[in-house]
């Protein structure tokens, strides 16, 4: 199939679906090969629902079971020259109570309180999504009282 030149960029960026998973007041983050912390998640497969993708990816990368919640954010992330990705983030409700088990895709897993996140080496879009989900969960807890 020939893609018109004007549509070329519309097909050039992969989509990565990420989840903000918070357990006991701490968000799950994974350290990648660039020594950055990132949210668990991964590439959206052709025909895959983004909500199914985030649940699958979090399970594969941490062995955590989650339920996908609301859409939090979407942005284009410039990794390095010639490498861009569209990031879509969802809030996730954690059903696992055990510590995360990191897969071979990452160096290590970490659990961080909201106050620790601003100082971490990670894209600002992830920090924004994490802050949004922490705030929404606090709002849900206050409403439930």
Where are these regions (language model features)?
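Nudix hydrolase/Nudix homology domain
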Residues: 37, 104-145
